[in-house]
Amino acid sequence: MELSYRLFICLLLWGSTELCYPQPLRLLQGGTSHPETALQPVVVECQEATLVVTVSKDLFGTRKLIRAVDLTLGPEGCEPLVSTDTEDVVRFEVGLHECGNSMQVTDDALVYSTFLLHDPRPVGNLSIVRTNRAEIPIECRYPRRGNVSSQAILPTWLPFRTTVFSEEKLTFSLRLMEENWSTEKRTPTFHLGDVAHLQAEIHTGSHVPLRLFVDHCVATPTPDQNASPYHTIVDFHGCLVDGLTDASSAFQAPRPRPDTLQFTVDVFHFANDSRNMIYITCHLKVTLAEQDPDELNKACSFSKASNSWFPVEGPADICQCCSKGDCGTPSHARRQPHVVSLGSGSPARDRRHVTEEADVTVGPLIFLDRTGDHEMEQWALPADTSLLLLGTGLAVVALLTLTAVILVLTRRCRTASLPVSASE
């Protein structure tokens, strides 16, 4: 599936600026424009001989800032003016005949056409991006002016299933939750820029109190956790490394219970991959609740404010190894769960062998980025909604059938009464 979409903005100007958005713009003296509401994501000034384009770094309105290096103007890919990371906007200033802009002469206008391209690329050695590719056509007309509105397409995610591998008493689970963490998410649909709320749990039965840890998490386009491409979310025995880059992913502190661990992940899709499914596989493990967390059993998040790691519980120094990428013995990353004995030394026929570690997969998470994917959305309707639609359809068919029978019987009765009237 093509993971890109086109956001169309027509800019029809006469020596002034006017964005084609539902919000009206007031034209001021000097050929400038002023929105009546919030700052527009793209503002264009068609001047006498130059074209000035100002792009908000919050281009999609999701508070996920784009990078200036991912923006170009025109077929020749003109780069923006130099700006600092602290600025909220990216600016282009080019001549009307530069950057491969096209010119067309009509009966009543001189039309210059070009486009703004946002083409996100993975940061560093990562293989994921968190925003979509967008091509925004720009058009300047002289001397006419007008306004054409366009609404952005909102990419979405679609449903998921959960697969659990466990034995006997210990049951591991990984669920997608609502934002308030109170209930499981009923409609697993996301937009780029949203945050997925994941909750890992261990159901202990009659066992002694246990503490749950997420040792490793990896995202792949198939259920196979060893598939490629892949993106590591948690690594090094509990370091949430996804929060190191442009994401706000983090563990939630404090825990609701020792046997439950919650964390958030900024949603994403794989760059240059036609598959629109993402599976998240986490390796879960437990320790005794009374055991203090250490480098091998921890839950650490990265704080961009302090530029440091911090744990959900336990001393702060247990997270220092996250920066080094070495937290002791090799991680359980991308392998099957290990089975150990939690027996008490009783005779062999009474001993229990259960898993204190397990791989749990949540998926598929289906990412939609085109309005044409509504068929996928319909596939994700809840069971009760499908039954309601089926019942409504059957009721309509029954009503139409009953109406047809009544009409046929009425016509026959009228036909049978005609000879009697003639004899009289």
Curated annotation (Swiss-Prot):
Tissues in which the protein is found: Expressed in oocytes.
This protein's name: Zona pellucida sperm-binding protein 3
Signal peptide bounds: 1-22
Record key words, sorted: Cell membrane, Cleavage on pair of basic residues, Disulfide bond, Extracellular matrix, Fertilization, Glycoprotein, Membrane, Pyrrolidone carboxylic acid, Receptor, Secreted, Signal, Transmembrane, Transmembrane helix
GO cellular component: collagen-containing extracellular matrix; egg coat; extracellular space; plasma membrane
Membrane topology: Single-pass type I membrane protein
Cytoplasmic-side positions: 409-424
Main location: membrane
Disulphide connectivity of cysteines: 46-140, 78-99, 217-282, 239-300
UniProt subunit comment: Polymers of ZP2 and ZP3 organized into long filaments cross-linked by ZP1 homodimers. Interacts with ZP1 and ZP2.
Organism: Callithrix sp. (Marmoset)
